[in-house]
Amino acid sequence: LPSLEYFACLLKYGEVALEAHEHFLKQTYRNRCRILTANGVDTLIVPVIHSSIKMPIREVKIDYSQSWVKRHWGAIVAAYGKAPYFEYFGSDFERVYQKKPAFLFDLNWELLTICLKLLRLKPTIRLTDSYQTEVEEGQSDALSLVHPKKEFRHNNLYLPVVYQQNFGTEFVSNLSIIDLLMCQGAEATSILKRSVFVD
């Protein structure tokens, strides 16, 4: 469930090469997302099984020996079960969790596809054929900037637009796209488009 910054990046560039052969990196958004709960921001992490430091992302298996699906879905229901649009969108996400894809890349691709469908967005996304060690001339490696340990304000991709959230009195920026979808429904796309940083 990518962050709002990730989606702002997709919208900003319109055409994106998604690295399908990179090496899996720990502590990135590749296996985590941030949602807003009654107790504040909660980071949901998909546990993975990887045997080497340079394991290709498409070979990274999800570790179902841990009860993460129950925890994730329980946290999502607790956070958004009473949100205005949960009844419309919740089942789309629940189906993916119930399918239990074997590989992290497949889980991420399914969740991204659902989010784009619900947002009615159609950026051009092509999967790379091989690991791209360098960025070609005229291109930007913008998606690599989207990282939980990097301050999004320095990336010039995402400019937060305040919207009504389920909890708290202060707006929390750059959460998972699920927060925006569940809280704003059809308005999510408009808010997201206004969140794109314009150079």
Q: Where are the predicted features?
A:
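Residues lining hydrophobic/aromatic ligand-binding pockets adjacent to catalytic sites
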Residues: L1-D199
